[in-house]
UniProtKB/Swiss-Prot annotation:
Red blood cells. Pfam families: Globin. Heterotetramer of two delta chains and two alpha chains. The gene is HBD. This is Hemoglobin subunit delta. It comes from Aotus trivirgatus. CDD domains: Hb-beta-like. It is possible that either Q-127 or Q-131 be Leu and that L-125 be Q.
Length: 146
């Protein structure tokens, strides 16, 4: 991912304020509500029958935290996203058979959640930088599929 020095600084500064557990749970929950076909990968999570059930599901929240933990690792290694996400790419491709388009969808949902949580602080320039990052992460996660 190519970010300018200013973009890297802005992304890092905002990410330092992110509550990974809260934002991760909301982002994954919204993915499952907005794109319900993604729920098939989470059948073991129990109740996903309504938006309230999804958003209140402790397994969704826990996995969302785990996902954003991995995203945090990516932010620390922006110059080597493919290497950083190689094992996760292999897992999601070979064992879980996740459609790689879902990575792009989750990235876009994450950007929406960040905008909702940070309001005016999440400027259009910061959004543009985060869009580059989530696109890079999605590409890295889809790498094993190619």
């Amino acid at each position: 991912v190519h970010l300018t020095g200013d973009e890297k600084s802005a992304v890092a500064a905002l990410w330092g304020k992110v509550n990974v557990e809260e934002v991760g749970g909301e982002a994954l929950g919204r993915l499952l509500v907005v794109y319900p076909w993604t729920q098939r990968f989470f059948e073991s999570f129990g109740a996903l029958s309504s938006p309230d059930a999804v958003m209140g599901n402790p397994k969704v929240k826990a996995h969302g935290k785990k996902v954003l933990g991995a995203f945090s690792d990516g932010l620390a290694h922006l110059d080597n996203l493919k290497g950083t996400f190689a094992q996760l790419s292999e897992l999601h491709c070979d064992k879980l058979h996740v459609d790689p388009e879902n990575f792009r969808l989750l990235g876009n949902v994450l950007v929406c959640v960040l905008a909702r949580n940070f309001g005016k602080e999440f400027t259009p320039l910061l959004q543009a930088a985060f869009q580059k990052v989530v696109a890079g992460v999605a590409t890295a996660l889809a790498h094993k599929y190619h």
